[in-house]
């Protein structure tokens, strides 16, 4: 039985988006997971995962669309002015949580940059990506705003992050169509990003071990994200097709307990164009989708998780 409960840890902020469309697909695993959905402070959201038969437990915390908000700011939540955001607040919450469970997986769904004056040192200092490292973020992906400074800006940012010598989150995105670009001949910008990806170690997916739970995490860059990135020179495969191929590769080559996806695709009221809902339906072996991009909250309202 997969159960879902919802509640706020802290009433001071509006939560960032989380999507997990198809919880019952978890029952295809060798053991059952129980998810507890919690909305919390400063855009940090969490899951607790229990593998009852094997007595495995995993907490997952995640962010997305942080948009260079290294400092907190004032906004209106439920009709009242509240303080939200800020990496110091995030780090405090993470530290408090890790006192209870040090084996916590921390994910980010992209668009970690562009939105405050911090973005002015994006390409030279990689401040946002390095700060994700300080938070203890395990895996992140690219959003459309990571391309705002063009191909050279993204490449310079990745190289600057590596040059810092600091602990950095792993980065995953599975649907970049490198083969098509190589066949057509790299543009200078494509070449810059390709080389920066190699330097940083960007992969289609990565495998993380937390305690006795092994998790594969893949990344997806959505169609609407590409439409919102006019300076992006990269070519991309269909997100669902690329994710399906990557999941099959994971199932073939990795012995993991669950598969998670950090997706910068988003959800919409119209299910026909709601990209991460489509992804969840098209690739049911993905157990968890962290959905960024649209800054919306998709509520799971079905009385039965089998629906």
Task: Give the ranges of each region predicted by the language model.
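Bacterial N-terminal signal peptides that target proteins for export
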Residues: 25-31
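Sec-dependent signal peptide cleavage junction
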Residues: 43-53
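A short, hydrophobic C-terminal helix/tail in secreted or cell-surface proteins
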Residues: 303-307
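Short, Lys/Arg-enriched N-terminal segments with co-localized hydrophobic residues
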Residues: 6-23
């Amino acid at each position: 039985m997969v159960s879902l409960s919802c509640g706020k840890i802290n009433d001071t902020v509006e939560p960032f988006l989380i999507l997990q469309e198809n919880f019952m697909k978890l029952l295809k695993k060798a053991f059952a997971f129980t998810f507890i959905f919690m909305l919390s402070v400063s855009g940090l959201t969490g899951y607790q995962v229990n593998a009852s038969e094997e007595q495995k437990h995993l907490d997952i915390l995640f962010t997305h669309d942080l948009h260079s908000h290294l400092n907190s700011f004032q906004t209106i939540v439920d009709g009242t002015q509240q303080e939200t955001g800020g990496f110091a607040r995030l780090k405090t919450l993470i530290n408090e949580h890790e006192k209870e469970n040090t084996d916590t997986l921390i994910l980010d769904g992209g668009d970690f940059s562009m939105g405050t004056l911090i973005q002015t040192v994006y390409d030279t200092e990689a401040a946002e990506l390095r700060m994700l490292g300080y938070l203890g973020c395990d895996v992140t992906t690219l959003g459309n705003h990571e391309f705002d400074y063009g191909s050279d800006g993204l490449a310079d940012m990745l190289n600057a992050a590596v040059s810092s010598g600091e602990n950095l989150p792993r980065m995953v995105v599975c649907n970049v169509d490198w083969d098509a670009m190589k066949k057509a001949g790299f543009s200078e910008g494509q070449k810059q990003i390709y080389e920066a990806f190699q330097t940083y170690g960007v992969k289609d997916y990565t495998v993380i071990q937390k305690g006795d739970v092994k998790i594969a995490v893949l990344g997806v860059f959505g169609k609407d994200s590409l439409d919102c990135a006019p300076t992006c020179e990269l070519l991309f495969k269909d997100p669902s097709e690329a994710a399906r191929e990557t999941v099959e590769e994971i199932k073939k080559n990795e012995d993991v307990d669950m598969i998670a996806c950090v997706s910068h695709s988003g959800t919409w009221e119209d299910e026909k164009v709601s990209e991460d809902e489509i992804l969840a339906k098209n690739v049911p072996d993905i157990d968890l989708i962290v959905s960024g991009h649209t800054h919306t909250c998709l509520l799971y309202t079905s009385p039965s998780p089998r629906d």
